[in-house]
Every structure is written in structure tokens, then in C-alpha cells.
Amino acid sequence: MNQIHKFFCNMTQCSQGGAGELPTVKEKTCKLSFSPFVVGASLLLGGPIAFATPLSGTQELHFSEDNYEKLLTPVDGLSPLGAGEDGMDAWYITSSNPSHASRTKLRINSDIMISAGHGGAGDNNDGNSCGGNGGDSITGSDLSIINQGMILGGSGGSGADHNGDGGEAVTGDNLFIINGEIISGGHGGDSYSDSDGGNGGDAVTGVNLPIINKGTISGGNGGNNYGEGDGGNGGDAITGSSLSVINKGTFAGGNGGAAYGYGYDGYGGNAITGDNLSVINNGAILGGNGGHWGDAINGSNMTIANSGYIISGKEDDGTQNVAGNAIHITGGNNSLILHEGSVITGDVQVNNSSILKIINNDYTGTTPTIEGDLCAGDCTTVSLSGNKFTVSGDVSFGENSSLNLAGISSLEASGNMSFGNNVKVEAIINNWAQKDYKLLSADKGITGFSVSNISIINPLLTTGAIDYTKSYISDQNKLIYGLSWNDTDGDSHGEFNLKENAELTVSTILADNLSHHNINSWDGKSLTKSGEGTLILAEKNTYSGFTNINAGILKMGTVEAMTRTAGVIVNKGATLNFSGMNQTVNTLLNSGTVLINNINAPFLPDPVIVTGNMTLEKNGHVILNNSSSNVGQTYVQKGNWHGKGGILSLGAVLGNDNSKTDRLEIAGHASGITYVAVTNEGGSGDKTLEGVQIISTDSSDKNAFIQKGRIVAGSYDYRLKQGTVSGLNTNKWYLTSQMDNQESKQMSNQESTQMSSRRASSQLVSSLNLGEGSIHTWRPEAGSYIANLIAMNTMFSPSLYDRHGSTIVDPTTGQLSETTMWIRTVGGHNEHNLADRQLKTTANRMVYQIGGDILKTNFTDHDGLHVGIMGAYGYQDSKTHNKYTSYSSRGTVSGYTAGLYSSWFQDEKERTGLYMDAWLQYSWFNNTVKGDGLTGEKYSSKGITGALEAGYIYPTIRWTAHNNIDNALYLNPQVQITRHGVKANDYIEHNGTMVTSSGGNNIQAKLGLRTSLISQSCIDKETLRKFEPFLEVNWKWSSKQYGVIMNGMSNHQIGNRNVIELKTGVGGRLADNLSIWGNVSQQLGNNSYRDTQGILGVKYTF
């Protein structure tokens, strides 16, 4: 291909220009611009080129609203017959739909060549010695052109006195061009006198031109001069403004015409010229060859993204040889983005007062960024970011210009680097290897530059802090950027002050600086970490001073990162992160935080060994449980451990003795006081025997480790103790869920005096020495869940008399008085124990209920049926206390109910004899449980409860007392069956414990006798005012015991299966339409079960 191309270039002046080989690129093959002579040459070589039958003369095409697409055909008869006349244009296109340019399409198929007329040659005999200009091939605007053939501008005619210029291939505004083959400007005509050769035509010109090119777009070649004049200039491949180019093919400027006499060769054309340009190049963009080389890209306000070839034109053999540019910035604000595969050959020229931002995203480093020079004029601004930027030639900056370096960018030249007056260099350094880093370098020297010209901006540095970096000039050809730590000129220091969220990795060895001059009061061997950012030590440093962590994070990036340090001091609020790597600290004074590894880092299978002594100050914290999924990590302190009230945090999956847990191993002696906080990471809890080991020491003081806060799993409370349950291994510390009977009694007896504060409780629990006959400690939250379950099922469970009070019947006339609306208030107090014999619960409740009859009917002349509705609000607050651990938990229930009731009396008038009562209601509640030191839990519950009651009212005797008070005595045996169906769904606590209620659908039976006395004074005989005191004795039996299952371990209320209830009260009518009633009841059961309740009710008759 390249040999054929070379043949055509020599024989026919190839439109891409350039003797010699074109670059071979992927999807970037050179396309040839054919003149009619080229077509003939192709036929001679056997090329299968065929064209459709042409039209004749200049053609005009108009796109109407209904005509959106047209196939163009060739046009003939465009070249003039007369000497020196201009060639005719091929197509004029107009459109009625400028807003639909993308829909107004011209198609040129692969068998079509659209060529304008060629200019006529001059003829002295005809009186016209000048050659004519070539015509334009397509002229129009607001179009889409899809080319799979050839579009050629007309060539200029040759002349003795003057020659013709080549025509343009496509000209117009608002053109969207998709080119798959060839678009070429016409060639200039040759000159045979002292007149210059004709100029080549441009391939594409216009404004607002989006172009997608997969073929070849090239300017026409300039005409040769065979006399004493200059060669003609090559045309541009594309020129205009607001150009948007996507190139996977080739753009080429036309070659300048050769001067074979005493003149100069013509200028090579530019590949792309214009203002407001956007270029995405994955092909080749080539300047034209000539006496003055053409630019590959020339313009202003450009954005160029390159992963292909951008190459300036090359010299011809003429007497004038002026280098062109690969990229020529003529003004405005410009960007050059370099991707992998980018090749720029030729100079990059930035005119005065222009701006160029270069982003180098090519990290292969295989070739220089520019094969040429970088020349920036006066008052220019050049910004570099990304990878280093290399230039094979010279670099120059004019007066008052600026060079900005960002990230890890640098500028390196193989030639000279020169700076004019008042040039400013600004470097913004985010992160680098901290070894001496070349910001600027030039193999042949840097001139016009000093350190005063540079401004270093360190975006990681805390505002106002002393910079840990410094820049200096080395050997007159390098600007070096490095750490102040290594400075030998008196400004050295060892402080790294990083702002919040900043992270700096030091990848060079920090050794003692023996040549420091103490200007900054630095000892030359100590490291100080300040500021809220993170400093990472990635090498095995050898400095011998102290490591002071005043703020932020000091993180290890390798093992033994500070092995020779005299000691490490972690101040309050600061963090030392070992990153899971073994370290030597000699001494570690921790008033801040020490992390075994990064938060949420993967599990560490090997222990982290820290050599040196640990002092854990009051504000200090050592964290082994850096992630909830990393339980089982081990921290080894290869030295002594002294606690001054700091905290050690571990994780554990708590169960039996074989539970998986983080561990602290101390090779030396443990002394002082260290508080231990253990987080259960999903363990179900279980009964332990000897305990779960979490800490081991070579030797240990008593109470060197004290439990902080509660340690819970499932239904169990764990505690920290020294040694095993059997009293062995007192140099080790264990978690246990059990306590022996003797000391549980001691705990219970001393609870009121020795457990007055939580700290005293923790110390006592931690110091217990267990023996045989131990018991396992239960969490008090179990009692709160049970108390809530009891309340939600029982607080809305009235009997007939609780709901209606007494039925008032006149003792003389037997007349019945009743109401249709009632309100009652209930207050109660409950105390019960749980089956574990550790937990005791007390609860207080209030209920506000309202109801009334909505229907009254009868089946016979004597009976009566009443139907009513009722609703209520209730609230309970409970507290459960463990007498052994002194931990408590509080529960609350708050909810509503709504339902129906129905009562039937055998004798509606007398209200004696048999009666039946039933009710059914739906209840819903919000519940909470909050244990000491634990996150509060919230859950809901709902369900249906109902009851059926029957009784017989028997009047035994009536009499009038000596004070004229009429009395009637009634006996009322009664029975009630209640089904409690309110329940909560299974609930998972914040600590992972699964909570399930038990004892649901409980059936409660009540059997009892009620005795009442209705009395009316003689002074009230004309009124309805009367009173009824009563006394009830009931036996209550429950089919189930309310309980809870926590991670498979169950506990339940005791004492409520068989309960005796005593109830007494009085009811009466205060006025004809107002009655009140009230009673007090006391329930007693086994195991200290008791429930006290009072009711006050009001009835109103309408």
C-alpha cells in the first residue's frame, strides 16, 4: 500500500501530500485523492472503478418538507471549452427545513464520483494566458452528507502568466458529514512563468460542521512553478468555525507546489483549521508538505482528544524550508487530552495570551509525548496534569507566562528549557513517592529560572501548617521536589501535617538527618503526625527518635515500619493503625486509639505481634474487633501491659467454652486497670463451663482487667472473670455465663449496698471466684418481653361486672334501673418471678375504657339481650431486675382495643336467674424493651381476645333493718373462659438475638362466687338512689405460662397457673341518671406472684 501510495504521490501529486511513507495505524490507512488522471492510472493498473451515467451541467436540488433524502449522481459538461475560463460548480443544494438538517440527507454511493469542472488552461494564441479556477463540487447548507464515493473539487487550469486555483469539494454551513471514502479539494494549476502556481482548494469549508470521518479528507495540492515564481499553496482538509470532528480515517493538508526555477516551494496546507474546534482523533491528522510545512491542527478554542497520529508536514526540496506545527494554538482557551496510542510529531506552538491545558492519560511511557518543540509565547498559560510530559526537542516560555503542574505531572525536555522574564511555575502535588521528584528537567540545561519563580501548592497540607516538602534546582538542569525531612540547608523538619480526608503515602525510607541545623527545633530523627489526615509509612524506616501522633491517623504500610523508633506516643483523638502488620514500638503510650487493622478489612489469620511495652491511658482505646465479620483475630503484646483506665475492645461469637473470639496475648506482666468491652457478633449464647478465654498474660495483677458494660448473647448475660470457673489459670481472663450459688447469695444480700453504682457492680462481678454448684445468669430483657406479652393479652379482659358495675334493682318493687353508656378506669400493679429464679418483674398499668349498648331485644316475655360496643386505651411500664448481676431492663406496652359485647339475662326485669355474657375484641400495641447498657428495642403486636361468661343470680333474703333500710342479699356463682390471642412476630434484637414469644393462645378459666347486698334508705324511697356493696372470691387457672425464647433458650413467668382472687367494692346510683361503681382486687399465686387492681366506673342514663 505504501509503495503504491508513493507511486501516486510522485506521479499525480497525492492529495494527502508528503513524499515517503505514511504512518501505518490501526483504522488509520491513507486514502488517496483521485483526479481524473488518477482514475486513468488506476484503470491501467487494473483497478475496478466504475461510475454511473452523469447528468450534464450545473445541477440544482431543493429539499422540500416532504423530500428528505436524495442520491446524488455525477455531473458532466462542467469544464469550459474556452481558454482560461473557470470550471463550473457541480451541485447547488437548498432546503426548506433548516431545522431538520439531520433528516435532509444527500447520499453518494460507492460507484459515484461527484467532481466539479476544471479550470481551462491559458492560451496565449487565444488572448487569455491565465488558467481558470476549478469549480466547487457541492454547495449548500442545513444538510447531512453521507459519502461512500468520491467528492472532488475542480482543478485549476495551467497558465503562462497566471494559473487557476483548485475548487472546494464541499462548502456550506450546518452540514453534518459522514465520510467513508474520499473528499478532496481541487489541485492548483501549474505556472510556466514568474507567476506563482495555483493554490489547492479546501476539501470542506463552513460553519457548524459535525464530521465523522472513516475515509480520507484532503486539501488539494498547490500547482508547480516551472518559471521563476513560487509554487502554489496546498489547500486545507477542513477549515471553518464550530467544527466537531470524530476521525478514524485521515485528514491531510494539501502539498505545496514545487518551484523548479528561482522561487520558493508553496506552503503545505493545514489538515484542520478553525475556531471553536472539537477533535476526537483515532486516525491520522497530517499537515501538508511544502516549503513551509503545513500544520496538522491550527486554531483557537480547541478541545483535542488524541489516541492516533497528529503529524506536521515535511519539507520539500525547495529553497525555503520552514517547519510547521503538529498543533498550533492561535488563541483562546484550549485543551489537549492524550490517551494511549497518542503520537504527536512536530512542534506544539502556543501563541501569545493563549491558554493550553494538557492532560496526559498515556501511562505507557514508550514514546515522548511530543516529538518536537513546545513553544509558548508571552502571557500564555500552559497547564499539565496526569502523567509526566516529555518533549524530544526544546521548551520555551515567553515573558509573563505561566506553567502549572498538577498531580504527578512533570515536564522533561531532551533539549533546552528556557523561561522569559516573570515566568511563574505553580505545582499542585497530591501524592508522590516522596523520593526526590523531578518537576522540571532539560538535558541541555534550564535558563531564566530560579526557585523564586516556583510556587508549590500542597493540597494535602493543613492550612497554615509548615510544608513537609521543599523544591530546589539541581545541576542547573533539574527542578527537584522532595521532603523537608531530607533538607540540608537549615529548613528541615519531621512534621507531617495533613488536613482532614487527606492521605499521604511515604514510599521512601526516613532515616536520621544528621546534617540538620535545628532552625525548626527538630532533632533530626523524630516523626510527628499532625492534622486530621492519614500518613502511611510504606517503607522500613530507620529514624531513631520518637514517633508522635498528635492528630489524625498514622498507618503502617509495611512490617517493621518504625523498628528503630525510641517510642510511639498516641495522643488523645489520634489513631495508630497497625494495618495487620507486625511492628516494633519499643514503648507505646496510648491516649488515643490503636487499631489492629483497617476498619472492615479482611480477616487476619495470623496474629499481629507488637514488640514493646503498652501503657493504656485513661482516654486510650485498643480495638481488635475492626469488623463484625473478623472475630477470631489475635493481638500479641510482646512486652508488659499497664492500664490506666483505658478500654480494650474485642468481638466474640458467644456460646459455650469453644466460642470464637478475638484475643489479647501479653508476653509480660499485666498491671493497673484496663476496661474490657466485648461485642457479641451474632452468637446465640449458651451455658459455659470453665469459660471463654479472651486474654492471656505471663503474669497479672488482680483486677488488671475489668468488664465495661454488659456482654449479652441470646438470653444470657456474660461476665469477665480472672481464671476459670474451677479456679485455674489465674493469669488468663475468661467470659462466663454462670455464677455459683454461694456467691449469688452474696450478690443478692449485698445488692442494696455494694451495687449502688454501675462501676461497683462491674468490679464485683468481675472479681467473683466461682466454685461448684454454679448457676447461669439470665438477661433481664427476658422479663421485659414476658411482661409486655402478659399486658397485651390481659389488660383488656373485663368481666360482666367490671364492665357494667352492679345491676340495680329496687329491693321493694324489683324495678330494674340500667344505663346505655359507661366509662371505666383501671389501675393495676403486678409482681412476678421467672422460672430462672433470678429475674423479678414489677409492672404498673392503666386502662381507660368506654362502651355502651347499641341494641336491646328479647326472645320471650321475660328475658333480655343487650349488644354493645366498647373501646379502650392501655399502657404498662415494667421493670425486670436480676438479683445476681443487678442488671435491669424496662419494658413498655401502649395500645388500643375495639370490640363488641353481648349480655343475656333470663329474667330481664328481676335480673335474677341465669345470665350469659360474651365479648370479642381486636387489640394492637407498640412495645419497647430497654436493658441497661443496651440499645433499645421496638416492636409491635396485635391479636384477638374473647371471653364467654355464665352465672346464676340467686336472691336469698330480703329484710328491713331497724333504721328503715331495705336490704336484699344475692348469691352469684360464676364462671368465665377467656382466650388470649395477642402476640408479636419473631423479633431480632440489635445484638442479633432472636426473640420468640411463648404461651400464646392461652386459655384462662375463672370460677368464683359473688355475694352482694343491695340497700336503700327510707329517705331515698322516692328516688332511685341505692347502693350495692359486694365481695367476690375467684379461682383462676391458666392453660399456659407466658414466656419468651431467646436464641432457643426459654424462660417463663411462674406463679400464675393457679391464682386466688379476692375482690370487694361497691356500686350505686347517685342520681336518677348517674351511677358509679368501684372495686379493689388482689390476686395471689405461688412463687410470690401477686396482682393488685382497682377499678372506678361511671354510668350515665340518657
Curated annotation (Swiss-Prot):
<dbReference type="InterPro" id="IPR013425">
    <property type="entry name" value="Autotrns_rpt"/>
</dbReference>
<dbReference type="GO" id="GO:0005576">
    <property type="term" value="C:extracellular region"/>
</dbReference>
<feature type="topological domain" description="Extracellular">
    <location>
        <begin position="1081"/>
        <end position="1093"/>
    </location>
</feature>
<feature type="transmembrane region" description="Beta stranded">
    <location>
        <begin position="846"/>
        <end position="854"/>
    </location>
</feature>
<feature type="repeat" description="N-terminal repeat 5">
    <location>
        <begin position="274"/>
        <end position="307"/>
    </location>
</feature>
<dbReference type="InterPro" id="IPR005546">
    <property type="entry name" value="Autotransporte_beta"/>
</dbReference>
<keyword id="KW-0812">Transmembrane</keyword>
<dbReference type="Pfam" id="PF18883">
    <property type="entry name" value="AC_1"/>
</dbReference>
<feature type="site" description="Cleavage; by IcsP">
    <location>
        <begin position="758"/>
        <end position="759"/>
    </location>
</feature>
<feature type="topological domain" description="Extracellular">
    <location>
        <begin position="53"/>
        <end position="807"/>
    </location>
</feature>
<feature type="domain" description="Autotransporter">
    <location>
        <begin position="814"/>
        <end position="1102"/>
    </location>
</feature>
<feature type="topological domain" description="Periplasmic">
    <location>
        <begin position="855"/>
        <end position="862"/>
    </location>
</feature>
<keyword id="KW-0732">Signal</keyword>
<dbReference type="GO" id="GO:0051286">
    <property type="term" value="C:cell tip"/>
</dbReference>
<dbReference type="Pfam" id="PF12951">
    <property type="entry name" value="PATR"/>
</dbReference>
<feature type="topological domain" description="Extracellular">
    <location>
        <begin position="828"/>
        <end position="845"/>
    </location>
</feature>
<feature type="repeat" description="N-terminal repeat 4">
    <location>
        <begin position="240"/>
        <end position="273"/>
    </location>
</feature>
<dbReference type="InterPro" id="IPR012332">
    <property type="entry name" value="Autotransporter_pectin_lyase_C"/>
</dbReference>
<feature type="transmembrane region" description="Beta stranded">
    <location>
        <begin position="1003"/>
        <end position="1011"/>
    </location>
</feature>
<feature type="compositionally biased region" description="Polar residues">
    <location>
        <begin position="741"/>
        <end position="755"/>
    </location>
</feature>
<keyword id="KW-0574">Periplasm</keyword>
<feature type="transmembrane region" description="Beta stranded">
    <location>
        <begin position="982"/>
        <end position="990"/>
    </location>
</feature>
<feature type="topological domain" description="Periplasmic">
    <location>
        <begin position="817"/>
        <end position="818"/>
    </location>
</feature>
<dbReference type="InterPro" id="IPR050909">
    <property type="entry name" value="Bact_Autotransporter_VF"/>
</dbReference>
<feature type="region of interest" description="Gly-repeat region (GRR)">
    <location>
        <begin position="140"/>
        <end position="307"/>
    </location>
</feature>
<feature type="signal peptide">
    <location>
        <begin position="1"/>
        <end position="52"/>
    </location>
</feature>
<feature type="transmembrane region" description="Beta stranded">
    <location>
        <begin position="955"/>
        <end position="963"/>
    </location>
</feature>
<dbReference type="InterPro" id="IPR011050">
    <property type="entry name" value="Pectin_lyase_fold/virulence"/>
</dbReference>
<keyword id="KW-0998">Cell outer membrane</keyword>
<dbReference type="GO" id="GO:0042597">
    <property type="term" value="C:periplasmic space"/>
</dbReference>
<feature type="transmembrane region" description="Beta stranded">
    <location>
        <begin position="808"/>
        <end position="816"/>
    </location>
</feature>
<dbReference type="InterPro" id="IPR054553">
    <property type="entry name" value="VID"/>
</dbReference>
<feature type="transmembrane region" description="Beta stranded">
    <location>
        <begin position="1072"/>
        <end position="1080"/>
    </location>
</feature>
<comment type="subunit">
    <text>Forms a ternary complex with host WASL (neural Wiskott-Aldrich syndrome protein) and ARP2/3. IcsA enhances the affinity of WASL for host ARP2/3, assembling a tight complex which has maximal activity in actin assembly. Also binds directly to host vinculin, which may serve as an actin filament recruiter. The central section of the alpha domain (residues 103-507) binds to the N-terminal head domain of vinculin. Binds to host actin filament tail upon infection of HeLa cells. Interacts with host ATG5; this is inhibited by IcsB.</text>
</comment>
<feature type="repeat" description="N-terminal repeat 1">
    <location>
        <begin position="140"/>
        <end position="171"/>
    </location>
</feature>
<feature type="transmembrane region" description="Beta stranded">
    <location>
        <begin position="1094"/>
        <end position="1102"/>
    </location>
</feature>
<feature type="topological domain" description="Periplasmic">
    <location>
        <begin position="978"/>
        <end position="981"/>
    </location>
</feature>
<keyword id="KW-0614">Plasmid</keyword>
<feature type="repeat" description="N-terminal repeat 2">
    <location>
        <begin position="172"/>
        <end position="205"/>
    </location>
</feature>
<feature type="transmembrane region" description="Beta stranded">
    <location>
        <begin position="863"/>
        <end position="871"/>
    </location>
</feature>
<feature type="region of interest" description="Autochaperone domain">
    <location>
        <begin position="634"/>
        <end position="735"/>
    </location>
</feature>
<keyword id="KW-0677">Repeat</keyword>
